[in-house]
């Protein structure tokens, strides 16, 4: 261990974040590898080690011949300060080597509020922030993850960005980098060739042009670069990598359990949901494969809980069979099985009673909107009757805790829709009184609301976000009408949602603002300790950026959007159709009931999703 690190660790919170050496960590002989890759997560160890994508990529990249992939996480504020004061550069956990010594540095980006943390990590490693400032071939700095579906706000900082699922592309990028090192290519030559790999976006080869009103006129590709970058996906999901021997953290993390991924994509088509669109087509694993992975992961890790992961776990075709099989294994070993947020329209009490035998937890539903009219607008395809029926069954089974998640500020929302949330919560309380066999323990209903953030690659990508003031007015209206003592109301911070809305639909001009914020000390801004709206407003004013232009402005359907050249598999015609359906209050069937012809099925052999 570095002597500077030895002196620092007693001075910071949770020093185990920074030491590595966990059970399952991959160590390699440096003399036997010719490419060193740093897999960076721009948040704390506890968040990054809970991320399923990080665990998968760590395994996939270390399985490549001649490659050693190591992990790097953002230090907390106290550690960051100590590292700067003591002159300790950012390092990888496995070897302790400085980040600047690696051939490739890849960031996993899943949230827009992590952008400034990327800059903090690069600077802490002594690496120039902007791609244009890094003239040598290595270290190659790139990114992947869900927010790369709009790459433009961070385009100036990365050499390239992965569009789609990284485990299907990263190996090709590293192989090309290996060839480039051996042949002595310039960075420009490498990037020119990398741009020809499917799913690779090289921002420096594309120049945005703007109209007089500030909207995007066109994205001009350099000669030889593709006009449109099409995402890459894992086509054989059944046999794709699942890290059964994943690292077991030596300190507590957010999701301290086995996370078993059942399928990718979603059949539902909720119009606000970015993940449900960009992860199409639906691909699932067989019950047998899930059973195999689940048991092996539990045996290796020693965890006493396993959770079933997907965008809509209750839509997994073999859920009953899988839960039965896993519980046969788990019950005798005292291992708990948990399910994430459930859909009220296919809630199964049989499943819940079985999985709660070891460890009982509360129920979580996400109606998203307070009235049926608005649920139809967003294509939620869940009725109030569905929710109350599911709650009644649960209360009859002895449950006395329910969490309900909603959004405020959805397109076409009125005060009647807002008040509908309070009325629905009251009906849940009444339902408990009518159905609970034992009311002595009382009822806890937790209602949580967040502010709707319009996202790229969704039918609502053209919609405005309500202003901060309007969001808080609706929060106050709802809070004042929550009368039942059994109901607790929580709401998400309006300032963060506004900033997220700016970044999520931003263009390349935001890069200067992001760097400005970082230079003012901004990083780890997904945490309340790190976020400061005044800092963002100050930087926006200095860089000539209008928050209302990006967050609160309605786009026309023919406007050129900053992400139009990045094809995530769903065609524009489908988004427009769903946008029009929403404004007519019309539902669209789920993918299992009827194919919408969105275009995503073309990624799979035979052109058919596993809906």
Over which residues does each language-model region extend?
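Radical SAM enzyme core and accessory elements
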Residues: 2-27, 31, 37-39, 484-611
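N-terminal [4Fe-4S]-dependent radical SAM core
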Residues: 8-38, 45-46, 203, 209-259, ...
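N-terminal pre-triad scaffold of radical SAM enzymes
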Residues: 37-43, 61, 248-274, 298, ...
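Conserved SAM/AdoMet-binding glycine-rich loop
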Residues: 39-40, 113, 295-403, 408-446, ...
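Canonical Radical SAM [4Fe-4S] cluster-binding loop centered on the CxxxCxxC motif
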Residues: 51, 252-288, 597-611
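A short beta-strand-loop structural module common to alpha/beta enzyme folds
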Residues: 66-78
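Glycine-rich beta-alpha loop elements in corrinoid/cobalamin-binding modules
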Residues: 75-220, 459-507, 515-528
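Flexible glycine/acidic-rich beta-alpha junction loops that bind and position SAM and/or redox cofactors
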Residues: 77-78, 153, 207-212, 317-318, ...
């Amino acid at each position: 261990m570095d002597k500077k690190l030895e002196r620092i660790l007693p001075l910071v919170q949770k020093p185990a974040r920074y030491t590595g050496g966990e059970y399952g960590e991959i160590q390699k002989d440096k003399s036997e590898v010719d490419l060193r890759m740093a897999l960076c997560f721009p948040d704390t160890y506890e968040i990054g080690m809970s991320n399923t994508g990080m665990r998968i990529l760590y395994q996939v990249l270390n399985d490549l011949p001649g490659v050693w992939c190591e992990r790097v996480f953002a230090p907390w504020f106290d550690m960051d300060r100590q590292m700067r004061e003591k002159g300790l550069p950012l390092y990888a956990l496995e070897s302790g080597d400085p980040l600047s010594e690696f051939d490739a540095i890849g960031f996993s980006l899943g949230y827009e509020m992590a952008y400034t943390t990327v800059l903090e990590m690069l600077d802490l490693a002594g690496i120039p922030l902007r791609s244009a400032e890094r003239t040598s071939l290595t270290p190659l700095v790139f990114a992947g993850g869900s927010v790369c579906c709009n790459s433009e706000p961070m385009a100036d900082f990365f050499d390239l960005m992965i569009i789609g699922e990284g485990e299907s592309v990263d190996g090709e990028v590293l192989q090309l980098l290996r060839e480039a090192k051996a042949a002595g290519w310039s960075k420009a030559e490498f990037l020119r060739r990398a741009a020809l790999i499917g799913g690779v976006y090289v921002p420096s080869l594309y120049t945005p042009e703007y109209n007089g009103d500030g909207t995007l006129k066109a994205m001009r590709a350099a000669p030889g670069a593709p006009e449109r970058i099409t995402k890459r996906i894992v086509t054989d999901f059944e046999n794709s990598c699942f890290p059964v021997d994943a690292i077991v953290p030596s300190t507590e993390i957010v999701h301290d359990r086995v996370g078993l991924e059942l399928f990718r994509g979603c059949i539902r088509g909720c119009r606000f949901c970015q993940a449900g669109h960009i992860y199409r087509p639906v691909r699932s694993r067989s019950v047998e494969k899930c059973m195999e992975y689940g048991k092996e992961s539990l045996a290796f890790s020693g965890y006493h809980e396993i959770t079933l992961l997907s965008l809509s776990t209750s839509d997994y075709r073999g859920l009953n069979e899988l839960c039965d099989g896993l519980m046969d294994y788990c019950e005798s070993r005292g291992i708990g099985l948990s399910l994430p947020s459930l859909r009220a329209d296919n809630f199964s009490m049989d499943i819940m009673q079985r999985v709660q035998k070891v460890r009982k937890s509360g129920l979580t539903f996400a109606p998203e909107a307070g009235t049926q009219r608005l649920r139809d607008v967003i294509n939620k395809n869940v009725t109030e009757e569905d929710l109350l029926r599911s709650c009644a069954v649960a209360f009859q089974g002895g449950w006395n805790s329910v969490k309900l998640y909603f959004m405020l500020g959805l397109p076409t929302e009125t005060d009647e829709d807002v008040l509908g949330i309070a009325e629905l919560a009251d009906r849940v309380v009444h339902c408990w009184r009518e159905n609970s066999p034992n009311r002595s323990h009382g009822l806890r209903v937790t209602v949580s609301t967040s502010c709707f953030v319009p996202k790229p690659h969704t039918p609502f990508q053209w919609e405005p976000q309500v202003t901060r003031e309007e969001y808080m007015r609706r929060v106050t209206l709802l809070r004042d009408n929550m009368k039942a003592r059994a109901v607790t109301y929580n709401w998400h911070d309006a300032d963060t949602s506004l900033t997220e809305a700016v970044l999520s639909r931003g263009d390349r001009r935001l890069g200067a603002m992001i760097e400005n914020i970082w230079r003012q000390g901004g990083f780890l801004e997904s945490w309340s300790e790190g976020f400061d709206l005044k800092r963002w407003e100050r930087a926006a004013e200095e860089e000539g950026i209008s928050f209302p232009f990006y967050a609160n402005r309605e786009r026309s359907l023919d406007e050129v959007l900053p992400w139009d050249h990045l094809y995530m598999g769903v065609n524009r015609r489908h988004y427009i159709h769903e946008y029009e359906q929403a404004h007519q209050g019309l539902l669209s069937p789920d993918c299992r009931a009827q194919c919408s012809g969105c275009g995503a099925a073309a990624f799979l052999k035979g052109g058919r999703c596993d809906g």
